[in-house]
Amino acid sequence: MDFSIKGCDWSKGTANGFLTGKSDCIVLGVFEAQTLSGAALDIDEATKGLVSRVIKAGDIDGKLGKTLFLHEVSGIGASRVLLVGLGRQDAFSQKAYGDAAKVAWRALLGTKVVQVTFTLAQLPVPERASDWGVRAAILALRNETYKFTQMKSKPDAGAPALKRVVFSVDPADDKAAKVAAKQAVALANGMDLTRDLGNLPGNVCTPTYLANTAKKIAKDWGLKVDVLGLKQIQALKMGSFLSVAKGSVEPPQFIVLQYRGAAAKAAPVVLVGKGITFDSGGISLKPGEGMDEMKYDMCGAGSVLGTMRAVAEMGLKVNVVAIVPTCENMPAGNANKPGDIVTSMKGLTIEVLNTDAEGRLILCDALTYAERFKPAAVIDVATLTGACIIALGHHNTGLFSKDDALAGELLDASREAGDPAWRLPLDDEYQDQLKSNFADLANIGGRPAGSVTAACFLSRFAENYPWAHLDIAGTAWKSGAAKGATGRPVPLLAQFLIDRAGA
């Protein structure tokens, strides 16, 4: 799909190109109380009051989410007009804009429209310019067009008719909007990769499959990749990671993918993604109901790989390293048992009180490995705890960090990207719950504050650099009728790196 940007100041008579230019449809916004947006006023004048007459007749009331097509419109180059309800003008918000864009795309995708002129990006969204509107609209469109049909014998209907979108933006935002469009496409491509990896079944998306995906990203975008196999992992003495992997016939992989966009001496940001490609719980077996969704336990890895693809396509001037420890967590005669004690790469011994708290066991060795890159910051991403879902539900990703500056950057990025996160505590007092009579620490701390104690566990292996942990258990995928991976938190991570790169 092709996206282009054209500057237009509707209030100053510079809209002739939009009024006369050939297009299958032009999208206009209508507020409640029959108030037209700037673009709609110009179109109304060019069509001799058609838009006003339709509104006056009550065919559309401007309520948010309502749409109306006008066909065979004369006086303009577009053959039809799509009116989109925006709600109350004094309550118009970023969310309202996103909802309006979403319903507009849904309406258009149900037609044979090939080329559309989209004017909503110029709507007066508080604290936002039209370049933000372009990015949000492209992401909304790509979200609407995403389908996962790879595993069906007869894939669903093909690509939508819509092929080209022309965005009208404020002339002062023209350059920024072009950058925003490029970034939005790259971000959507990264999110689609993340969703595809998450939606694939565990018998397809194995640790080896993830490793091959990383190799393909490296080949396509000129990145450096190293994939460590069993013997190399053993040589590094990653006993914690290996204790989880040993119960599966699928060989573990330790993926290191490097993007160099800045000076060689510039310290990289390291992203660590949990890559449990299927989590049965091990000997501490999960209930059968809903276990199919444990294919999503690699969404941390998927989001890190998706972010790397997006960053490479954007060409950001920043160095980024992705580390993905990946394996399955399965019950077997040689699998971890409750009460087993394993030795991590750092040398700390861990009492495995619950084999279903395995994500932290593979991440801790990856966090130790990350030290060799002398990182500017390390962010691990994991579907780590059900407790985070109880605490935050499915809207906010859980954010943990003792570094206020890093936490602030991530929260700012989450707001800018529309990929919300919420900071949770990481007080030292919670560490007491991880005490063990027989090892340096236990892998669980009981039911109270389960997401916090999981983060506390990881913090013991991330003491030598600025570190943050993102618990995406509630945000990486959806259940029910809309079941599927969401692609989060790729927008948050990408925005964080955009900000770091100063792009």
UniProtKB/Swiss-Prot annotation:
It is found in: Cytoplasm. The keyword Repeat does not apply. PROSITE patterns: CYTOSOL_AP. It catalyses: Release of an N-terminal amino acid, Xaa-|-Yaa-, in which Xaa is preferably Leu, but may be other amino acids including Pro although not Arg or Lys, and Yaa may be Pro. Amino acid amides and methyl esters are also readily hydrolyzed, but rates on arylamides are exceedingly low; Release of an N-terminal amino acid, preferentially leucine, but not glutamic or aspartic acids. GO terms for cellular component: cytoplasm. Mn(2+) 1 binds at D279, D356, E358. Keywords: Aminopeptidase, Cytoplasm, Hydrolase, Manganese, Metal-binding, Protease. Its EC number is 3.4.11.1, 3.4.11.10. One of its GO terms (biological process) is proteolysis. Mn(2+) 2 binds at K274, D279, D297, E358. The active site is at K286, R360. Binds 2 manganese ions per subunit. Its main location: cytoplasm. One of its GO terms (molecular function) is manganese ion binding. InterPro entries: Leucine_aapep/pepB (IPR011356), Macro_dom-like (IPR043472), Peptidase_M17_C (IPR000819), Peptidase_M17_leu_NH2_pept (IPR023042), Peptidase_M17_N (IPR008283). NCBIfam families: PRK00913.1-2, PRK00913.1-4, PRK00913.2-4, PRK00913.3-5. Presumably involved in the processing and regular turnover of intracellular proteins. Catalyzes the removal of unsubstituted N-terminal amino acids from various peptides. Belongs to the peptidase M17 family. This is Probable cytosol aminopeptidase. It comes from Burkholderia mallei (strain ATCC 23344). The lineage of its organism: Bacteria, Pseudomonadati, Pseudomonadota, Betaproteobacteria, Burkholderiales.
